[in-house]
């Protein structure tokens, strides 16, 4: 069963989410420092009539890395071609993408940390020298053919910057980490998005949805879509706090933004009574993939102090006990 607070992209939601994305920096809310610096770099590159240097965006899923890539394309008046690292299985796949680029194009690679070392080797000269080295044959008879590429900007996005090899990371001239959003920022995003959906969202309703969105715009917009359904069924043009609460409670998203999976995760850790639990054990207990736990469930819990990650495993913090209305002292020391 799909989680309403799932952060990964749903293919059916892509058209919906794209229609709500801002097209320029003026409409982009949050990440102020990143916006300010990008504006400067874009303006400078346009004055010099040059491509932007390569850019790496990192941070938890759903914070706007893809949106920023598209805004950069708009601000640079450049074409953008989008792909994801898992789709680039062979060096020939990457070569086909690179040779189809035009001067000044932007290539956006999502989940760039999942590129294989062999693919990275092809990417290095393309990023540094705008050159593609193709090896024909094998052994002593192997030959390298060098193909010049048009100047382009590579924008990479990753939820796991630590998994990037140092040579690849060092080839990005600009590196930015996106941070979780404040509730007030999410509320503004929601009110703007509601207008695009032909609804008016009251400020208190927007804040209520924001509070349950795990500080993540993608989740906030998905919840807004579901709350809108409740409003439509009741023939309401205005999304009220009461209707938002009703919808979110019905969806099983509590006041902290936790759903059933989050609660199962925290209950597992608190039941361990401060004994660390390894990732593999958690994945087995929850019947979830380890990557899903690390990329989807844990980032928000870690950032907000609900769990601690140690060398031996995960431990629930006192904040988790409070969230589950458990007595920390009793749970910690009872036999």
Swiss-Prot record:
Could you tell me which residues belong to the region Head domain (RuvB-H)?
255-335
What is one GO cellular-component annotation here? cytoplasm
Q: What is its EC number?
A: 3.6.4.-
Q: Where is this region: Large ATPase domain (RuvB-L)?
A: 1-181
Compartments where located: Cytoplasm
Alphabetical list of PANTHER family matching this protein: HOLLIDAY JUNCTION BRANCH MIGRATION COMPLEX SUBUNIT RUVB (PTHR42848:SF1), PTHR42848
What HAMAP family does this protein map onto? DNA_HJ_migration_RuvB
Please state what the annotation says regarding this protein's domains.
Answer: Has 3 domains, the large (RuvB-L) and small ATPase (RuvB-S) domains and the C-terminal head (RuvB-H) domain. The head domain binds DNA, while the ATPase domains jointly bind ATP, ADP or are empty depending on the state of the subunit in the translocation cycle. During a single DNA translocation step the structure of each domain remains the same, but their relative positions change.
Provide the function of this protein. Answer: The RuvA-RuvB-RuvC complex processes Holliday junction (HJ) DNA during genetic recombination and DNA repair, while the RuvA-RuvB complex plays an important role in the rescue of blocked DNA replication forks via replication fork reversal (RFR). RuvA specifically binds to HJ cruciform DNA, conferring on it an open structure. The RuvB hexamer acts as an ATP-dependent pump, pulling dsDNA into and through the RuvAB complex. RuvB forms 2 homohexamers on either side of HJ DNA bound by 1 or 2 RuvA tetramers; 4 subunits per hexamer contact DNA at a time.
Name the NCBIfam families on file: PRK00080.1 (NF000868), ruvB (TIGR00635)
Q: What does the record note on quaternary structure?
A: Homohexamer. Forms an RuvA(8)-RuvB(12)-Holliday junction (HJ) complex. HJ DNA is sandwiched between 2 RuvA tetramers; dsDNA enters through RuvA and exits via RuvB. An RuvB hexamer assembles on each DNA strand where it exits the tetramer. Each RuvB hexamer is contacted by two RuvA subunits (via domain III) on 2 adjacent RuvB subunits; this complex drives branch migration. In the full resolvosome a probable DNA-RuvA(4)-RuvB(12)-RuvC(2) complex forms which resolves the HJ.
Protein name as it appears in the record: Holliday junction branch migration complex subunit RuvB
Organism, as annotated: Campylobacter jejuni subsp. doylei (strain ATCC BAA-1458 / RM4099 / 269.97)
């Amino acid at each position: 069963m799909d989680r309403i607070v799932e952060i990964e992209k749903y293919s059916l939601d892509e058209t919906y989410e794209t229609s709500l994305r801002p097209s320029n920096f003026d409409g982009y809310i949050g990440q102020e420092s990143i916006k300010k610096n990008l504006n400067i770099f874009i303006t400078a590159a346009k004055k010099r009539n040059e491509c932007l240097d390569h850019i790496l965006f990192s941070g938890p899923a759903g914070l706007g890395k893809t949106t920023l890539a598209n805004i950069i394309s708009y601000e640079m008046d450049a074409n953008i071609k989008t792909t994801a690292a898992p789709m680039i299985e062979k060096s020939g796949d990457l070569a086909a993408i690179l040779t189809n680029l035009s001067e000044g194009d932007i290539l956006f690679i999502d989940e760039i940390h999942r590129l294989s070392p062999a693919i990275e080797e092809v990417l290095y000269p393309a990023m540094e020298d705008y050159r593609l080295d193709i090896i024909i044959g094998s052994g002593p008879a192997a030959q390298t053919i060098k193909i010049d590429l048009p100047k382009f900007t590579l924008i990479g996005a990753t939820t796991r910057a630590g998994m990037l090899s140092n040579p690849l990371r060092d080839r990005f001239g600009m590196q930015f980490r996106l941070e979780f959003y404040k509730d007030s920022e999410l509320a503004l995003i929601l009110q703007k998005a509601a207008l695009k959906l032909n609804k008016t969202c009251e400020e208190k309703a927007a804040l209520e949805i924001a509070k349950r969105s795990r500080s993540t715009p993608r989740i906030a917009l998905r919840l807004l879509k579901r709350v809108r359904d409740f409003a439509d069924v009741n023939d309401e043009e205005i999304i009220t706090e009461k209707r938002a609460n009703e919808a979110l409670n019905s969806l099983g998203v509590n006041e902290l933004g936790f759903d059933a999976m989050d609660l199962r995760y925290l209950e597992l850790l608190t039941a361990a009574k401060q004994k660390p639990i390894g990732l593999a054990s958690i994945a087995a207990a929850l019947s979830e993939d380890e990557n899903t736990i690390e990329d989807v469930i844990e980032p928000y819990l870690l950032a907000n102090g609900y769990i601690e990650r140690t060398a031996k495993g995960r431990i629930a913090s006192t904040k988790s006990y409070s969230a589950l209305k458990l007595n920390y002292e009793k749970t910690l020391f009872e036999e």
